[in-house]
């Protein structure tokens, strides 16, 4: 029976399978098998025992149902795994879990799950980067109105919008590589982190286990890998979500009926409303923005998991069972949705131009002021002169430049040709160069494998 929407509505099957309870069990078994092999290599247990444990440390031998049956009796999840594995290993079962504490297995298995999940996140981020780069290149010269405080400001370009998001996605990719160094760690240090239970060969055993599993050993732990590591991971996932939220919010606003410069794709048979047949709602970007709120909220319990009693208590455990799979699956849904939205993004050039001229050149107040300053009027005086003209044009619903032509204060410094050259399309500064620089940087990072 599916209860949580991540079971049936959100996320790809690929990501959900990683956090499926059967795969989680397999990762725990993988760690137990690696531990047995390490013990055999240092001479602590027979090689034959390590071989049998390794062969049977999988869900074909160790059934999830049996693990649950044992746990229901003993009320300890990892000991249930140990008992179930030991049962199928016969006489060799006595070597299962030798020297380990539960979180040697749990934290190391978690690192394996996180590693698989981050591989999907990285792939999606790089695909999203490619889409944004193409959009930035294609729309490098698509001039539109820039808005600050929800009001028309001065012109910008769609190339700038996409390059801004592109640069942010690139930063996330770079953060991800740095993050993996700190997050993809495991431990074989025993009950309080001293490794006393592993004897003189403790460091060698831990090294062998981590090399076997493709992880690094944490430098120091108590009973657990410290949860600042998980908090950083959850913050990273939320930070990526915030970028997708930002993108979704902008697209939703630009899709408003009265703006309608762009629109997320809308299928031929898609229904927008159960009662309003005409509706073309931005449901994909709304979903992205909504799911982001869940990822933001999961950062708080991740932070609260860091301070625990002494060498460790159990209050982090139940929380992590929820926030780790939930955050990864929901971010997976968000990334894949945003890729679809951007790939099918629809543009309305006539509305982009209409909005650019909607204020009847009030948006040219800044370049008009700067032109006056360039011609000799003091900057502060020019600001006040243009401000008064802009207010007059607004009150009278007239074109600012037409009002300016009637002003002696303006014509004293500027010719009619000077005023005619003040067009929104001409006032985008270094937008093209900025976009090109971002693209060049991203391409350089791609060549470096980042």
From Swiss-Prot:
List UniProt keywords, sorted A-Z. Lyase, Purine biosynthesis
Family indicated by similarity: Belongs to the lyase 1 family. Adenylosuccinate lyase subfamily.
GO BP terms, alphabetized: 'de novo' AMP biosynthetic process; 'de novo' IMP biosynthetic process
GN (gene name): purB
EC numbers for this chain: 4.3.2.2
Enumerate the catalysed reactions. Answer: N(6)-(1,2-dicarboxyethyl)-AMP = fumarate + AMP; (2S)-2-[5-amino-1-(5-phospho-beta-D-ribosyl)imidazole-4-carboxamido]succinate = 5-amino-1-(5-phospho-beta-D-ribosyl)imidazole-4-carboxamide + fumarate
Is Zinc-finger included in the keywords of this UniProt record? no
Protein's name according to its UniProt entry: Adenylosuccinate lyase
The lineage's top-level taxon is Archaea
Main function: Catalyzes two reactions in de novo purine nucleotide biosynthesis. Catalyzes the breakdown of 5-aminoimidazole- (N-succinylocarboxamide) ribotide (SAICAR or 2-[5-amino-1-(5-phospho-beta-D-ribosyl)imidazole-4-carboxamido]succinate) to 5-aminoimidazole-4-carboxamide ribotide (AICAR or 5-amino-1-(5-phospho-beta-D-ribosyl)imidazole-4-carboxamide) and fumarate, and of adenylosuccinate (ADS or N(6)-(1,2-dicarboxyethyl)-AMP) to adenosine monophosphate (AMP) and fumarate.
**GO cellular component terms given for this protein:** cytosol
Q: How does it assemble?
A: Homotetramer. Residues from neighboring subunits contribute catalytic and substrate-binding residues to each active site.
Q: Which residues form a coiled coil?
A: none
Q: Kindly list the organism's lineage.
A: Archaea, Methanobacteriati, Methanobacteriota, Thermococci, Thermococcales
Q: Which InterPro entries match?
A: AdenyloSucc_lyase_C, Fumarase/histidase_N, Fumarate_lyase_CS, Fumarate_lyase_fam, Fumarate_lyase_N, L-Aspartase-like, Pur_lyase
Active site residues of this protein:
149 (proton donor/acceptor), 273 (proton donor/acceptor)
Q: Where does N(6)-(1,2-dicarboxyethyl)-AMP bind?
A: 9-10, 75-77, 101-102, 223, 274, 279-281, 318-322
Q: What pathway, per the record?
A: Purine metabolism; AMP biosynthesis via de novo pathway; AMP from IMP: step 2/2; Purine metabolism; IMP biosynthesis via de novo pathway; 5-amino-1-(5-phospho-D-ribosyl)imidazole-4-carboxamide from 5-amino-1-(5-phospho-D-ribosyl)imidazole-4-carboxylate: step 2/2
Annotated GO molecular function terms are: (S)-2-(5-amino-1-(5-phospho-D-ribosyl)imidazole-4-carboxamido) succinate lyase (fumarate-forming) activity; N6-(1,2-dicarboxyethyl)AMP AMP-lyase (fumarate-forming) activity
List the Pfam families.
ADSL_C, Lyase_1
- The set of disulfide-linked cysteines is none
- The top EC class is lyase
Keyword Chaperone in the entry? The reply is: no
